[in-house]
Amino acid sequence: MEDQPPTEIQISVETRYLPEQSSPEQEHFAFAYQITMQNNGPQTAQLLSRHWIITDAEGHVQEVKGPGVVGEQPTLQPGQRFRYTSGSVLSTPVGSMHGTFEWVSDTGESFVVPIPAFRLAAATVFH
């Protein structure tokens, strides 16, 4: 893996609480997150894998690893973007996610792009 990535992949995240899929009384809080990946660099790159670390408000951690995202391993030309939506279920109304995406450039160089931590929070405060 290269210390300096061969291209720049920008990651942005939007989250949403899903009350219609949640059951707070059963400690079941559903969230959707939309990830946008944009290739702002000079080289084409393909997403190989993802690694998520999901933490609830009580400190319970789930790790998710796998190839690509939502069944795809998109290839992004310079200037291109790819957007997908997925979800996570927590046992608490608040939590966080962070992780990494592993990519390979069109010259065969592997590199990792960090996904900064983002918050998952139910829109309602439960008493």
UniProtKB/Swiss-Prot annotation:
Q: The ApaG domain covers which part of the protein?
A: 3-127
The record's annotation in PROSITE patterns points to:
APAG
Coiled-coil boundaries: none
- This protein is called what? Protein ApaG
What S-S linkages are listed for this chain?
none
Q: Which Pfam families match?
A: DUF525
One GO term (biological process): error-free translesion synthesis
